[in-house]
Amino acid sequence: VLSPADKTNVKATWDKIGGHAGEYGGEALERTFASFPTTKTYFPHFDLSPGSAQVKAHGKKVADALTNAVAHMDDLPAALSALSDLHAYKLRVDPVNFKLLSHCLLVTLACHHPAEFTPAVHASLDKFFSTVSTVLTSKYR
């Protein structure tokens, strides 16, 4: 459960990211593919080379979904319901991949905002991404 302090940290961090969310989403996705090659299996139709426009575009979709989640932290199941359905029933993404991408998002944010990435912010973002992952995989059961 996200505490009020966690929510404040997440919102403040997302505000600082601003217009870079899409860029960071693409970078995190690239990092995920490089670090965990098995995640590429869900994107056989993509050009997965570094700097690929398709990876950047999908990274922006990830970032947009997270921006929506930040705006609706008090009701994530409703905010992410359609996305959960898509990943569970149509795309059938292995739930572990959300954890892998979450880790790469944390690394990407830490690289770009080291001064703001305090232990408290790190913990809050980790809890937030974990909560989002749990919601996205809730319909797998």
Curated annotation (Swiss-Prot):
Domain of life: Eukaryota
Matches recorded under SUPFAM superfamilies: Globin-like
Keywords of this entry: Acetylation, Heme, Iron, Metal-binding, Oxygen transport, Phosphoprotein, Transport
Binding-site positions, heme b: 87
Modified residues (N6-succinyllysine): 7, 11, 16, 40
GO terms for cellular component: blood microparticle; haptoglobin-hemoglobin complex; hemoglobin complex
GO MF: haptoglobin binding; heme binding; iron ion binding; organic acid binding; oxygen binding; oxygen carrier activity; peroxidase activity
Gene Ontology BP, a term: hydrogen peroxide catabolic process
Phosphoserine modifications at: 3, 35, 49, 102, 124, 138
Residues recorded as bearing N6-acetyllysine in the entry: 16
Binding residues for O2: 58
Residue numbers carrying Phosphothreonine: 8, 108, 134, 137
Modified residues annotated as Phosphotyrosine in this record: 24
The Globin domain, residue ranges: 1-141
InterPro entries (alphabetical): Globin, Globin-like_sf, Globin/Proto, Hemoglobin_a-typ, Hemoglobin_oxygen_transport, Hemoglobin_pi
One Pfam family cited in the UniProt record for this chain: Globin
Tissue-level expression: Red blood cells.
Spans traversing the lipid bilayer: none
Family label: Belongs to the globin family.
Biological function: Involved in oxygen transport from the lung to the various peripheral tissues.
Subunit architecture: Heterotetramer of two alpha chains and two beta chains.
Record-given protein name: Hemoglobin subunit alpha
Organism: Pteronura brasiliensis (Giant otter)
Source species taxonomy: Eukaryota, Metazoa, Chordata, Craniata, Vertebrata
